[in-house]
Regions:
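C-terminal membrane-anchoring or membrane-association module
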Residues: 263-284
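Bacterial N-terminal signal peptides
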Residues: 13-26, 266
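Structured domain cores in non-transmembrane regions
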Residues: 35-39, 47-156
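Juxtamembrane/start-of-transmembrane alpha-helix segments at the extracytoplasmic/lumenal side
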Residues: 250-264
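Extracellular low-complexity, O-glycosylation-prone Ser/Thr/Pro/Gly-rich "stalks"
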Residues: 56-58, 68-70, 82, 89, ...
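Sec-dependent signal peptide cleavage junction
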Residues: 25-36
Length: 284
C-alpha cells in the first residue's frame, strides 16, 4: 500500500471519534431528543366540608421554574390567584416561560366533596405544579409544588393549605371574593370583592395556613378545614407513553442516547483500527 493510502486509513478512527462526539454533544444539548410527550390526567378532589376551590392551574415544567415556593414571597401572579381567584396572570406568566412544557386550567369551582379532571402533556422526567384558591379565605391556596410526574401508572398526593402572605386575614366577607357566600350559603350585607386592597397588604411569605380563626364573618364550623384540603392524582395515559421500540429514554438529560452513540463510535473506531493493522501487515 502507498504511503498516501496508509494516511487515509489512519484518519478513519479519528473520523469515527469526531462523528460520535458530535452526535453525542448534539443529543446532550437537546434534553428531550428522541422523546415523545406523555399525556397526564390530573384529578383534583376537594377534601374539605366548607371550602370551595377555584379551577386549578396545572403546569408541567422543568426544574428551572417554581410556580410557588414555601418560605418565599408570592409572585404578583400567584397573589392574583390566591386573593381574587384570578388565574389569568399566572397562566400568562407560565405560558411565556421556556421552562414550561404545558399548562391548563379547570372551568368551574370544585365544591366540597367534588372532583375535577384536567389533562396536560410533558416529556419524561418533568415536574408538575398546581395552584387553586381556597375561595372562603383572604389569600389561602393549595397545590403541588414541583412534584415529579410518574413515568407510568398513577401517583396520588394529598396537599395542604397555604397562606400566600399577601393579604391580612380579616375573614370579613367585604374582603373575600363574592362566590364564597353563594356557594357555602352563609351570607351578609357585604357583597365581597375580586380586587386586591392595598390597605390589607401583608408583605409576608408563602407559609402553612393557620386555618379559619372565626370571630368575624367566617366561622370554623362553616368554613374551617383540617389538612389535607385536596387529593391530587396524576395518571400517565398508557396510549400516550413514549414508544418502547428504541433504546430506553433517560430522565430527560439525553445522556442515555448519547451513550448509545458513543458506543457506536467506539465500534467504528475498533473497526478502523483492525483495517489499519491489516493494511500495515499487507504492506510488510
Amino acid at each position: 500500500m502507498k504511503a498516501g493510502s496508509l494516511k487515509r486509513w489512519a484518519l478513519a478512527p479519528a473520523l469515527a471519534i469526531a462523528t460520535a462526539a458530535a452526535l453525542a454533544l448534539a443529543l446532550v444539548a437537546s434534553p428531550v431528543a428522541g422523546q415523545a410527550n406523555t399525556t397526564y390526567t390530573v384529578t383534583v378532589e376537594n377534601l374539605t366540608t366548607g371550602q370551595p376551590l377555584t379551577p386549578p392551574v396545572v403546569v408541567t415544567h422543568s426544574s428551572d421554574i417554581d410556580v410557588f415556593e414555601p418560605g418565599q414571597a408570592a409572585s404578583s401572579q400567584l397573589q392574583a390567584l390566591a386573593e381574587n381567584g384570578n388565574n389569568d396572570p399566572l397562566l400568562t406568566l407560565v405560558g411565556s416561560s421556556s421552562a414550561v412544557y404545558d399548562s391548563a386550567t379547570g372551568t368551574a369551582p370544585i365544591l366540597p366533596g367534588e372532583t375535577a379532571t384536567i389533562s396536560v402533556e410533558a416529556p419524561a422526567g418533568s415536574l408538575i405544579s398546581t395552584a387553586m384558591m381556597l375561595i372562603c379565605t383572604n389569600d389561602g391556596f393549595s397545590g403541588l409544588d414541583s412534584v415529579a410526574l410518574p413515568a407510568s401508572g398513577s401517583k396520588t398526593v394529598e396537599v395542604n393549605a397555604y397562606d400566600a402572605g399577601t393579604e391580612t386575614n380579616t375573614e370579613d366577607f367585604a374582603d373575600i371574593v363574592p362566590p364564597c357566600q353563594a356557594v357555602i350559603g352563609v351570607t351578609s350585607d357585604d357583597e365581597g370583592t375580586g380586587e386586591t386592597n392595598p390597605a390589607l397588604a401583608e408583605n409576608g411569605v408563602v407559609s402553612a395556613h393557620a386555618g379559619i380563626q372565626g370571630g368575624t364573618d367566617l366561622t370554623t364550623a362553616d368554613h374551617g378545614w383540617t389538612d389535607p384540603v385536596a387529593k391530587i392524582t396524576l395518571t400517565a395515559d398508557a396510549s400516550g407513553l413514549p414508544s418502547s421500540g428504541g433504546p430506553p429514554l433517560d430522565d430527560g438529560s439525553g445522556i442515555t442516547w448519547a451513550l448509545y452513540v458513543a458506543v457506536g463510535g467506539a465500534l467504528l473506531l475498533g473497526a478502523g483500527s483492525v483495517v489499519l493493522v491489516a493494511s500495515r501487515r499487507t504492506v510488510r
